[in-house]
Amino acid sequence: MILSEIFKTQLDPKVSYLHEPFERRYSLNLDLSEIFKPLIVDRVIFTLINKEMIKPEHFDQELNFCYLNDSGRKIFIQEFDRKLNSTLKYPKLERKVSYRYMLRLECYKLIKNFLEKKPYDSFKIYW
């Protein structure tokens, strides 16, 4: 999902700030995920737990590990997709944008950093 937004811009997904590039991994994808994990993924998890959408029967336990089973993954992906398509007011644009589009806006800020040599100011949760 982040990678698809990177590909819609002029950025090279192999060039990053935080993560070491590897042969079979796009490190910029990982850098941007660090910014948005708490905002998107963690909130989806808390929603699923607080609304009791995910229950113990949605997990499989093997050895000392616990995994979402197929029905649990389906619930998670549906809620994750709903979150990506929901909107919030983006401070600099002063209008609502989807969380998905917000990822692309972050890519544009990186491009601006490269081209205009302006300091990069990553997205911050503002509530």
Task: Give short role names for the model-derived ranges.
Residues 1-127:
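Active-site helix-to-loop segments that bind/position phosphate- or nucleotide-bearing substrates
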